[in-house]
């Protein structure tokens, strides 16, 4: 909750990836706030006020996930809206002739994004969402200490450079929020 607020102000890509993880945590507890309260939140060193805030925040997200049909997969509207915002900014950067570094990073990452999208479950996601999914997937692999192949590493490197290109425009992205 506190991390999400901070990331939302500082780095929208990191915010989206964090929220993907939070959604997965909530799913792992079957969107049951009682289980989250008893098993997950005690892991943190919250004082009573912070614990109550965290409980309300997770409860709100769990309810949103249920109401919006994201109990098993997908993302809540607040996360999707942030992705749309990033996608809009992405299109603006691609159209800006002064953003040659961003454009170069994009065209280097594009073949990997297209390949990843082709390997998807048949649902054609926008390029930016595919890139975010790839970054989240590699994060999960690393958290689980699973090996990452050379091809995957090359793809993630190119996609990460695209994110770095976006971070260089952080001031303008933050102004959009």
Language-model segments: which ranges?
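N-terminal interaction modules that seed assembly of large macromolecular complexes
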Residues: 2-73
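Short runs of predominantly hydrophobic/aromatic residues within well-ordered alpha helices
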Residues: 12-19, 33, 54, 58, ...
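Amphipathic alpha-helical interaction surfaces
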Residues: 25-28, 46, 60-71, 85-96, ...
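A charged, amphipathic interaction segment
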Residues: 76-135
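Glycine-rich, aromatic-bearing surface loops/beta-hairpins
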Residues: 114-172
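A structural motif
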Residues: 3, 45, 53, 62-66, ...
């Amino acid at each position: 909750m506190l991390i999400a607020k901070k990331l939302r102000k500082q780095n929208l890509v990191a915010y989206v990836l964090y929220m993907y993880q939070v959604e997965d945590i909530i799913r792992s507890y079957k969107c049951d706030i009682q289980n989250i309260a008893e098993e997950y939140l005690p892991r943190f060193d919250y004082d009573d006020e912070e614990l109550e805030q965290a409980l309300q925040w997770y409860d709100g997200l769990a309810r949103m996930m249920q109401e919006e049909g994201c109990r098993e997969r997908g993302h809540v509207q607040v996360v999707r809206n942030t992705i749309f915002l990033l996608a809009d900014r992405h299109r603006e950067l691609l159209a800006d002739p002064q953003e040659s570094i961003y454009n170069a990073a994009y065209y280097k990452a594009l073949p990997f994004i297209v390949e990843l999208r082709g390997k998807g479950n048949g649902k054609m996601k926008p390029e930016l969402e595919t890139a975010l999914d790839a970054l989240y997937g590699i994060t999960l692999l690393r958290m689980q200490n699973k090996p990452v192949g050379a091809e995957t590493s090359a793809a993630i490197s190119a996609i990460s450079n695209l994110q770095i290109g976006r971070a260089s425009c952080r001031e303008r992205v933050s102004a959009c929020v």
